[in-house]
């Protein structure tokens, strides 16, 4: 941490970031300072209806508004089951830098390439899935509800062969 002007105290110069970056090495990432009225974005969308326009027919999706609020940097969806689970997703991976889920209700089961055991994420638990990791959703409860957060909001999904389950990458 850079020394403060008075090294005998814990004072931080007004121009310095409290974590030690004086702002001289890196330009700020955002235009600021701003008034709250210029920057506040309402991301809660309780009135937003669920839609059945996602990749799976057995769940419905509700956009939480994060993509619009973050210029596409982050996407968030409320996802819930509407029919019994009828088929695994098949092995695939997503082109994203962050993929997080938080299960509100029920449970979800994954298989991961190179991992022998099924990974279960139950209500009150979360999962951070590293970028590019091949996986297969192999089960879920009929009452599943979760929040999914992705970075970026828009991303590609690629199917991969069964050989991935054995750790063979093409």
Task: Annotate each predicted stretch with a short phrase.
Residues 114-132:
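Short acidic-glycine-tyrosine-enriched beta hairpin
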Residues 116-118, 142-144, 161-164:
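Short, glycine/charged-enriched secondary-structure capping and boundary segments
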Residues 67-74, 84-100, 114-116, 142:
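A short beta-loop-beta micro-motif enriched in histidine and acidic residues
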Residues 57, 93-94, 120, 130:
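Short solvent-exposed loop/turn micro-motifs enriched in small/polar/acidic residues
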Residues 78-81, 93-112, 149-152:
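Short, conserved beta-strand element in jelly-roll/cupin
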Residues 2-83, 157-170:
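A short, N-terminal "cap"/entry segment at the start of jelly-roll beta-barrel domains
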Residues 122, 131-156:
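Ligand-binding loop in jelly-roll beta-barrel domains
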